[in-house]
Every structure is written in C-alpha cells, then in structure tokens.
Design a protein with these regions (language model features):
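A short, charged, amphipathic alpha-helix used as a generic interaction element across diverse proteins
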Residues: 20-48
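Residues in well-ordered beta-strands of folded domains
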Residues: 6, 31, 51
Length: 67
C-alpha cells in the first residue's frame, strides 16, 4: 500500500496522514506507485511525498520532484 502524505502544486497542499482532514482524504491510499502518480498528474501537482509500507512494519518516505 502507498499513502500520499502531501500533494504539492497549483495551490494544493493536502495532507492524508490524519493531521488535517480534507475532502480528498479517501484518495490518499493507493495500491501501487503508478496510481499515486496518476492522481498527481490528474490534479496538476508538482510533487508527492509518499510513504511506502514495506513488510507491514517498515516505512519509507520518498519526496518526489516533478512527476
């Protein structure tokens, strides 16, 4: 599972980590990285900060540049 923590660009600053509720909260969990990037492109974002869940307990945060 991939969770988008932040979406940046075109005035968007959305958080999906529970610290701030947004109307897009339901769209922050993706089955794969391709779906997350498609979401970013669809909304005209300049980047995503992703949290990848690896083997359940390990997490890795990856800030992305322009996608």
């Amino acid at each position: 599972m991939i969770r988008v923590l932040r979406v940046m660009g075109k005035g968007l600053y959305l958080r999906g980590d529970g610290s701030r509720t947004t109307k897009f909260a339901e769209a922050f969990n993706f089955p794969d990285i391709g779906a997350a990037i498609d979401f970013c492109r669809h909304h005209g974002c300049q980047g995503l900060e992703l949290m990848l869940f690896v083997q359940g307990a390990q997490t890795l945060t990856i800030p992305m540049g322009d996608v």
